[in-house]
């Protein structure tokens, strides 16, 4: 996934400000993706899901239509090493996915230049304008487009959304073991990079709360 471009807090007093700023940038990026055309609906669903469920770019493009369980509000993800995990889908992402599935995906999969039809066999959830499965480079390119449109300052990438997902879960009270499972990390040690965030948060709480801090 590369190195995260979301800056880690270096000053405990700045942690709350940093977390709010990153959350605001993510929200602004997602909200600035229009929903007027099939490609816009696709992109909105793609990036809402990336942030809602913390998926890697490779995992996003490998999703099939059947991967999404709308009734149970979850997605089945084939992660690294062929390991499968079930991840919840948030309300905003689920709404965006429904809009994409109903209004956009059929329009992206007509028989055109050999592209598969929606009923003819292309199982991919996210389709290109030619009706084929998106590539990871497509995902990164489209995210850069919308990041510029939203004037997002941080280096926007799929991993930036994934890192923000984990950071905001930790800030909201989730424990590392739960985050490990949601991210699909094989080892807890991989997830422990987020202890830097937790340490900064605890230091902020301590500094604000202890009379002799």
Q: Language-model features: where?
A:
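Conserved catalytic core of the tyrosine transesterase superfamily
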Residues: 1-213
């Amino acid at each position: 996934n590369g190195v995260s471009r979301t800056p880690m807090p270096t000053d405990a007093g700045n942690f709350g400000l940093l977390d709010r700023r990153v959350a605001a940038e993510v929200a602004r990026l997602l909200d600035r993706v229009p929903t007027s055309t099939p490609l816009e609906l696709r992109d909105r669903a793609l990036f809402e899901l990336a942030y809602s469920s913390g998926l890697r770019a490779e995992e996003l493009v490998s999703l099939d239509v059947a991967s999404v369980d709308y009734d149970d509000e979850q997605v089945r993800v084939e992660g690294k090493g062929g390991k499968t995990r079930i991840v919840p889908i948030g309300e905003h992402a689920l709404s965006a996915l429904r809009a994409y599935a109903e209004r956009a995906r059929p329009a992206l999969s007509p028989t055109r230049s050999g592209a598969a039809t929606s009923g003819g066999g292309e199982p991919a959830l996210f389709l290109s304008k030619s009706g084929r499965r998106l590539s990871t480079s497509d995902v990164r390119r489209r995210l850069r487009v919308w990041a510029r449109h939203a004037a997002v300052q941080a280096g926007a990438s799929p991993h930036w959304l994934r890192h923000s997902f984990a950071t905001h879960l930790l800030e909201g009270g989730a424990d590392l073991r739960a985050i490990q499972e949601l991210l699909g990390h094989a080892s807890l040690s991989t997830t422990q990079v987020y202890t830097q965030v937790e340490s900064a948060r605890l230091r902020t709480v301590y500094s604000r709360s202890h009379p002799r801090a």
